[in-house]
């Protein structure tokens, strides 16, 4: 696989070519994903739940994300590698710069930040300092205590309008990717069409430019439960490499996710 950059993703959006993304946490799986040509990987703070057994992502630290970023980069030198900025690691633009620097030095090509237009200044400051940003909207797991659990977001018109505004504000501030989690497919379509940057979805229908799954969900090995928006590709194929290839093909062909994985 050739080295993937944000310019490739922008080109694919313009061409209408969909792309697959998956989380990764170690060198071995990162290598497998690169060999199967997954173009974008995310070292997610989901590691707190799927690796550490925590009930949410809040305890994860910047140092832990940096460690796993180094591991993933060692296994996948050519993917576009995003790294999550953990809870309270970007409370101020200054703090965000310090912690984003650690993740970029660990091998990330981009950092992912959760939040709406209130993080626009942080996005702007990072972008001005050569740190590309993916802005995460919708169900932002670090806000689980505000939401009262892991719940679909943007169902009423006022919140939907605010999310569209958030996406456009963050793009204007310099965000190079928008990630939408657990939002109605109709809202995801509005945002995908409104934004000029690539939009990645999870639980957001099949109209976004890209899709992302947690690798443990994709392989059906999550300890607790299978989210509505996920699919066990390993059960369908019986082989990890074939499962990854099937996931990529289904995303590119627009046949994953289908209605059963989508919120209305």
Curated annotation (Swiss-Prot):
InterPro entries (UniProt xref): Pantoate_hydroxy_MeTrfase, Pyrv/PenolPyrv_kinase-like_dom, Pyrv_kinase-like_dom_sf
Catalytic residues (positions): 181 (proton acceptor)
Record localization: Cytoplasm
Top-rank taxon: Bacteria
Cofactor(s) for this UniProt protein: Mg(2+)
The record's free-text note on cofactor binding: Binds 1 Mg(2+) ion per subunit.
Pathway: Cofactor biosynthesis; (R)-pantothenate biosynthesis; (R)-pantoate from 3-methyl-2-oxobutanoate: step 1/2
Any one annotated GO CC term: cytoplasm
Family: Belongs to the PanB family.
Binding partners and assembly: Homodecamer; pentamer of dimers.
HAMAP family: PanB
Protein name per UniProt: 3-methyl-2-oxobutanoate hydroxymethyltransferase 1
Organism: Aliivibrio fischeri (strain ATCC 700601 / ES114)
Lineage: Bacteria, Pseudomonadati, Pseudomonadota, Gammaproteobacteria, Vibrionales
Gene that encodes the chain: panB1
């Amino acid at each position: 696989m050739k080295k993937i950059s944000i310019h490739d993703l922008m080109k694919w959006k313009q061409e209408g070519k969909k792309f697959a993304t998956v989380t990764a946490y170690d060198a071995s799986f990162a290598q497998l994903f690169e060999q199967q040509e997954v173009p974008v990987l995310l070292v997610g703070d989901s590691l707190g739940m799927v690796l550490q057994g925590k009930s949410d992502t809040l305890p994860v630290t910047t140092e832990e994300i940096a460690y796993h970023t180094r591991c993933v980069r060692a296994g996948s030198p050519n993917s576009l590698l995003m790294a999550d900025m953990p809870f309270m690691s970007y409370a101020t633009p200054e703090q965000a710069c310090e912690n984003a620097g650690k993740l970029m030095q660990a091998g990330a090509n981009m950092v992912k930040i959760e939040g709406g237009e209130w993080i626009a200044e942080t996005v702007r400051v990072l972008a001005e300092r050569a740190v590309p940003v993916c802005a995460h909207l919708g169900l932002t797991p670090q806000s689980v205590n505000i939401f009262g659990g892991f719940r679909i977001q943007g169902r009423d018109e006022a919140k939907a309008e605010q999310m569209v505004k958030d996406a456009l504000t963050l793009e204007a501030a310099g965000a190079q990717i928008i990630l939408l989690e657990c939002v109605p497919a109709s809202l995801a379509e509005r945002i995908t069409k409104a934004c000029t940057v690539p939009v990645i979805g999870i639980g957001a229908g099949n109209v976004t430019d890209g899709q992302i799954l947690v690798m443990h969900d994709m392989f059906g090995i999550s300890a607790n439960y299978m989210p509505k928006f996920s699919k066990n590709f390993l059960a369908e194929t019986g082989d990890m490499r074939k499962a990854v290839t099937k996931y990529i093909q289904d995303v590119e062909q627009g046949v994953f996710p289908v209605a059963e994985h989508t919120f209305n």
